[in-house]
């Protein structure tokens, strides 16, 4: 019998009684009649001894409480899954572009760790090719590095800076055409915005890529997303930070979004990322994974600059993002004022409004030298604080219009701007200046169609 991977206590005893181990196929009947069938997965050392984890045929993992198992049987032999990196050296192809690939801890190109039961990123060139062999026909991975190992919700400004430094280092190599960054999807848009502002003089594409479903799932989007991202990075045509993810639910096309106009708009769909009131820079046809085809959808993207990129500043962390809701106490603003915050981004309603009851707290914040920026919860459309009375009152006390910036982009930008200057007039000037394509200004039409409309099927 194979060795159990961290199954202890009740769960370990039950499996031993039935002669079962990790990798065996099992059929479990629960006390309520629910049947679970699949492969026994390892149990993490951090897990309890009350559950048995099973990977079902649909790719999902489910934990079954031991005290609810009425029947346990083995319908057939399973197998303990394994992962093998490519053996031997990867042959360099001078006809292919050179790309640096970085990992920050997302599920892109992940494999199952059968000691902990978790998914771990493949971050050496051999591991990446072992996970996605089609990469050999698309790029040369001349540099593969694990920059961070974080769930994206744990990202902080110091991590954005670490990634930025690694990007600048990679693109300082004249042989590298572009950089691909594997990143968790939940806060990918924040990181994309941060890199867009803090790196100046990009001499090649920087492409953030993720996966809504890890590569141990049959429905994983990891391979096609990674190949599309690498193809776009290797193309070397764009000098911007971008995000490359599924264009729609099938595996036909990935879209490349501008890093300051993109948002995760769905919790679980593979096409969760959308360019908001903007058109993606390009689409990548990945029906043939070994021969992805790039089609540009707009021509106003920034071209790579000559020379080497550089870090242009940092991020002031004493900045808050506050979403207004009816009945919400303005004391939330006083909290940040009392704690010495330097900036507040408001997500207001409609054209940029909050309750008039908030005016006193907002005026107090402005009088204390705090930059207060207004964005809209609507996401689509532009803040206009000159139309209605509330907007004019807010403008009169010193609230800065956030134009048509997405709230999270305005949040990151304000952190960046406040790191550069304390002068509130200069803060307003910079916040209303288009630095990295974050302010479209209504110049792009066709960004408001429903998901199944013509924009979505670009």
UniProtKB/Swiss-Prot annotation:
Asked if the Swiss-Prot or TrEMBL record annotates the protein with the keyword Protein transport, the reply is no
Gene Ontology BP terms: amino acid metabolic process; regulation of translational fidelity; translation
Supply the SUPFAM superfamilies for this chain.
Answer: GatD N-terminal domain-like (SSF141300), Glutaminase/Asparaginase (SSF53774)
Q: Which PROSITE patterns match?
A: ASN_GLN_ASE_1, ASN_GLN_ASE_2, ASN_GLN_ASE_3
Query: Could you tell me which Gene3D superfamilies the record lists for this protein?
Result: 2.30.30.520, 3.40.50.40, L-asparaginase, N-terminal domain
For this UniProt record, give its keywords in alphabetical order, as a comma-separated list. ATP-binding, Ligase, Nucleotide-binding, Protein biosynthesis
Summarize the subunit comment: Heterodimer of GatD and GatE.
Listed PANTHER family: 60 KDA LYSOPHOSPHOLIPASE, L-ASPARAGINASE
What exactly does this protein do? Allows the formation of correctly charged Gln-tRNA(Gln) through the transamidation of misacylated Glu-tRNA(Gln) in organisms which lack glutaminyl-tRNA synthetase. The reaction takes place in the presence of glutamine and ATP through an activated gamma-phospho-Glu-tRNA(Gln). The GatDE system is specific for glutamate and does not act on aspartate.
Looking up HAMAP family in the UniProt record yields: GatD
Name the NCBIfam families for this protein: asnASE_I, gatD_arch, PRK04183.1
Q: What is this protein's name?
A: Glutamyl-tRNA(Gln) amidotransferase subunit D
User: What species is given as this protein's source?
Assistant: Methanopyrus kandleri (strain AV19 / DSM 6324 / JCM 9639 / NBRC 100938)
């Amino acid at each position: 019998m194979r060795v159990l991977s961290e199954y202890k206590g009740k769960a370990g005893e039950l499996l031993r009684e039935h002669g079962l181990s990790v990798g065996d196929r099992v059929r479990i009947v629960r006390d309520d009649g629910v049947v679970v069938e699949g492969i026994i997965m390892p149990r993490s050392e951090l897990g309890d001894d009350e559950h048995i984890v099973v990977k079902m045929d649909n790719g999902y993992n489910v934990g079954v409480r031991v005290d609810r198992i009425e029947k346990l049987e083995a319908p057939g032999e399973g197998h303990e899954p394994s992962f093998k990196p490519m053996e031997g050296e990867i042959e360099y192809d001078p006809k292919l572009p050179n790309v640096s690939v970085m990992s920050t801890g997302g599920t892109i190109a992940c494999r199952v760790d059968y000691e902990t039961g978790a998914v771990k990123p493949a971050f050496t060139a051999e591991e990446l090719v072992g996970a996605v062999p089609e990469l050999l026909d698309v790029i040369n991975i001349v540099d593969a590095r694990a920059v961070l190992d974080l769930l994206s919700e744990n990202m902080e400004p110091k991590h954005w800076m670490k990634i930025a430094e690694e990007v600048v280092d990679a693109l300082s190599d004249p042989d590298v055409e572009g950089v691909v960054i594997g990143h968790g999807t939940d806060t990918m848009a924040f990181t994309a915005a941060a890199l867009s502002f803090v790196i100046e003089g990009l001499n090649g594409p920087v492409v953030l890529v993720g996966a809504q479903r890890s590569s141990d799932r049959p429905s994983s989007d990891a391979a096609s997303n990674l190949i599309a991202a690498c193809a776009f990075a290797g193309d070397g045509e764009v000098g911007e930070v971008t995000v490359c993810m599924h264009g729609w639910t099938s595996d036909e096309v990935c879209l490349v979004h501008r890093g300051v106009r993109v948002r995760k708009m769905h919790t679980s769909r593979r096409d969760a990322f959308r360019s908001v009131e903007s058109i993606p820079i390009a689409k990548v046809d990945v029906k043939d994974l070994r021969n992805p085809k790039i089609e540009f959808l707009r021509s106003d993207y920034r071209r790579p600059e000559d020379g080497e990129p550089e870090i242009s500043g940092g991020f002031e962390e004493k900045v808050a993002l506050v979403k207004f809701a009816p009945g919400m106490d303005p004391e939330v603003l006083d909290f940040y004022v009392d704690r010495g915050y330097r900036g507040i981004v408001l997500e207001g309603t409609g054209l940029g409004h909050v309750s008039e009851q908030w005016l006193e707290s907002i005026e107090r914040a402005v009088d204390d030298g705090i930059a207060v920026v207004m964005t809209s919860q609507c996401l689509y459309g532009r803040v206009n604080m000159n139309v209605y009375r509330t907007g004019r009152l807010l403008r009169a006390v010193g609230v800065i219009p956030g134009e048509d910036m997405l709230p999270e982009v305005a949040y990151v930008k304000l952190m960046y701007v406040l790191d550069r200057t304390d002068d509130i007039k200069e803060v307003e000037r910079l916040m209303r200046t288009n630095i990295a394509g974050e302010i479209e200004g209504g110049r792009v039409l066709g960004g408001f169609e429903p998901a199944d409309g013509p924009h979505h099927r670009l």
